[in-house]
Every structure is written in structure tokens, then in C-alpha cells.
Amino acid sequence: MADSERLTAPGCWAACTSFSRTRKGFLLFAEIILCLVILICFSTSTSGYSFLSVIEMIFAAIFFVVYMCDLHTKIQIINWPWSDFFRTLVAAILYLITSIVVLVERGNGSKIAAGALGLCAAGLFGYDAYITFPLRQQRHTAAPTDPADGPV
């Protein structure tokens, strides 16, 4: 039993980690790391703003695991492209608002760093929303140019 698990484990691990090399995988990983850094900066200065970083880090980690393990093809009751688009769009808007409020308040160095990193996170989430937009990914087929009824 242990030998069969050992033989299938590298294949499973390779399948799971191959997602992290894609553009979407890299973006989700960067979102998780950036949310963690912003959380650390907010927790040292003002803990009231850390809720956004915690929630977005959890959501990004959930989507990372779902896409990494290919669960989005197995769980089809959820429309994953639209869910991911709305997650990133809401995160970009909330990070933009929160960062502007934090930078206007002017606090200590870690609060200013969190505000500046929040603006970077808003840009990252906005870019992720742009590339995730489901209607942008649909390909339109060209209309037929030949007459269907024959020569006129």
C-alpha cells in the first residue's frame, strides 16, 4: 500500500504544482503573500484594517487550492470564473478605498507601508480581475462568408 502511494504521489504532486507555474497560479500566490505582508503591517499599527487582509488571504488560498487540485472541473455547481472575477473585483475596490483612507490618516511607518502595499494589492487584484473576466475569454467564431443557398 505504501509503495503504490509513493508511486502515485510524485505524479499527483506534479499535477498539483503545475498550476503554480501558470500566470493565474502566480497571481494567486502573489495575492496570498501580499495580503500576509499587509496583515503584518496593519497588525503592528492599526488592527482595525486587518480584517480585509485576512479575508482576502483566505479567499485567495481557497481559490489557489481549488485551481491547483483541479476541483473547479469537478465541482460544477459553482461558476468559478465569475466567482473569481467578483472576488478580485471586490478586493481591488476595497483595497483601494482602505489604502486611500489609511494614507490620508497618516500614521506611523508601518501604517504608511500598509497603505502603499494596499495600493499595490489593489493593482494586483485589479489586474487579476481583468484577466479573469469571463466574457473576455470567450472566443467568437467568424461568420460564414459563403452563401448557404448557392449563387444568387
UniProtKB/Swiss-Prot annotation:
PROSITE patterns: MARVEL. It is a multi-pass membrane protein. InterPro entries: Marvel (IPR008253), MARVEL-CKLF_proteins (IPR050578). The chain crosses the membrane at residues 25-45, 48-68, 85-105, 112-132. One of its GO terms (cellular component) is membrane. The keyword Lipid biosynthesis does not apply. Residues 19-137 form the MARVEL domain. Its main location: membrane. Signal peptide: none annotated. Glycans are attached at residue 108. It is found in: Membrane. Keywords: Glycoprotein, Membrane, Transmembrane, Transmembrane helix. This is Proteolipid protein 2. It comes from Bos taurus. The gene is PLP2.
